[in-house]
Amino acid sequence: MRTIKKFWNWIKNEEGRTLYFDGYIAQDSWFDDDITPKKFKEELFESDGDVIVWINSPGGDVFAASQIYNMLKEYKGKVTVKIDGLAASAASVIAMAGDEVLMSPVAMLMIHNPSTLIWGEESD
């Protein structure tokens, strides 16, 4: 059986559970190494209690981040978000799901206007 590599990790401790987000946020994963809503939901709701969410992510798919945001907002326990490196782009959406949001003095939260990319020829 193949081990799935994830950019998050749950740690259960006396205060509740701690979740580490470290990597790109994606709707689906081709290589099982992205933060995806489906897998995250399974792990979030397999236990209860308060949750601490550590974020260090450059962002990714805003729709996947929106799903994770909604899951954290619906979660019954207290959600504390801690940004210890970078919470950029779509990761900033997840950061806003916390009942409390804390940042290291050397961390960065980057929120930007929506952007898109298109390509093709003039006649397309």
Task: Give the role of each language-model region.
Residues M1-D124:
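Terminal-region recognition feature
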